[in-house]
Amino acid sequence: LHTIGRKLNEIKIKKPNQIIERIKRYIEENYQIPEMRLSLIAEKFNFSPAYLSALFKNSCNQNITDYINAVRIEAACRYLIQNEYKISHISELVGYANVTYFYKVFKNLKGCSPRDYLGKYWEGET
């Protein structure tokens, strides 16, 4: 019985981690969708938003919205470095319907505006 109990605990621990990895992969592959948010992901994976929020926060030490924003801003940085698109277009490419909100999130995560980030990149500071 002790062995069975231990195995069940291992399964319980492993399964949430697998779910979280699938959710993270889904976000990383679909961050461009402007509607990407907790409710959409919860529906996709058949969880209540409250349960998914708690599971993600417990496993990743950050909420889903923060994770989505981090993925989007990292993608925006890659687009900025390519120097092929205007910043307003980059905000759309990475899933932000509102360019002002994109600037706010970018500055919050990177400590500077997208334009300043690009300048720092070319100066070798990032």
Language-model-derived ranges and their functions:
Residues 116:
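C-terminal interaction modules of eukaryotic adaptor/scaffold proteins
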Residues 20, 24, 43-46:
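Amphipathic alpha-helical surface "interface" segments used
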Residues 1-12, 24-36, 56-60, 77-86, ...:
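Basic, amphipathic alpha-helical hairpins
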